[in-house]
Amino acid sequence: MQNQRIRIRLKAFDHKLIDASTQEIVETAKRTGAQVRGPIPLPTRKERYTVLVSPHVNKDARDQYEIRTYKRLLDIVEPTEKTVDALMKLDLAAGVEVQISLG
């Protein structure tokens, strides 16, 4: 797998969960002899929702909710066969979306 690069994008709603998963991937890749670039924190997406509290009148009474999506980017440079096998067997926490691309 010479001149290959594995790019891993992680998404989660909980920043502690995404940091723990990122650290686990970095440790696994370094243990198998690959070089890791990152983790690079990407911009956090904040979605805000405003909901009327009253079912009929009182337009001034509203609740506001926010959901944050945290993202991280990892590049594994010059991965070995052991690196790919270890990453495939890695069991990450539920709630973390993982996108893997070869480049």
Curated annotation (Swiss-Prot):
**Which SUPFAM superfamilies does the protein's record reference?**
Ribosomal protein S10 (SSF54999)
Report the family membership.
Belongs to the universal ribosomal protein uS10 family.
- Origin species, per record, is Saccharophagus degradans (strain 2-40 / ATCC 43961 / DSM 17024)
Q: Which PROSITE patterns match?
A: RIBOSOMAL_S10
Please name the Gene3D superfamilies in this protein's record.
Answer: Ribosomal protein S10 domain (3.30.70.600)
> Keywords, A to Z?
Ribonucleoprotein, Ribosomal protein
Q: Which GO biological-process labels does this protein carry?
A: translation
Top-level division of the source organism's lineage: Bacteria
Q: Its gene?
A: rpsJ
Q: What is this protein called?
A: Small ribosomal subunit protein uS10
